[in-house]
Amino acid sequence: PAAEYVTNAFSTDIKDEFKDDAEPRHVSVAGRIMSRRVMGKASFIELQDSKGRIQVYITRDDICPDEDKEMYNTVFKRLLDLGDFIGIEGFVFRTQMGEISIHAQKLTVLAKSIKPLPIVKYKDGVAYDSFDDPELRYRQRYVDLIVNDGVKETFQKRATIIRTMRAALDEAGYTEVETPILQSIPGGASARPFTTHPVSYTHLRAH
């Protein structure tokens, strides 16, 4: 099995805890490449972890301090794609544009994305390549959760609400009982649906 990659910070925590007058904080983060700008010997990428996104500044000589520059020239510039998982070790700083970022000192490739993601691109405030087709979003929910941040937030809020309600009712002595639900469209995985008719609505078929 692959070795575990140990992290010690999340993107949102790094931004919230950053102080300009403090000593540079060394962090280890991991996430998915959501965008990148390659400019010769230096590049910027946007890394997304389970909490949010943060910018990473990568230079060839920092991640390749020896004479061998293959990690930057070949792996990073040519082989890595949007959607790939990488690990970054470095220190936190603020760029000249005022954005809190990580200055990478070590890059580790963690996992390759088999298929390219429909990453949303912005230019002059206009979004391009948006993954907003309703049918595709429901059929490929895993992609929807990756590229559309609001969807993940909705699921997290829903899980929190259900967990809180269940805990409160359980503490009050209630018992949770699962009951079957009738619907007009048959469904299910391995279960065989049956047909019934509501007494008051004989013209309706329920499954």
Residue ranges and their predicted role:
Residues 1-205:
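Class II aminoacyl-tRNA synthetase catalytic cores and aaRS-like
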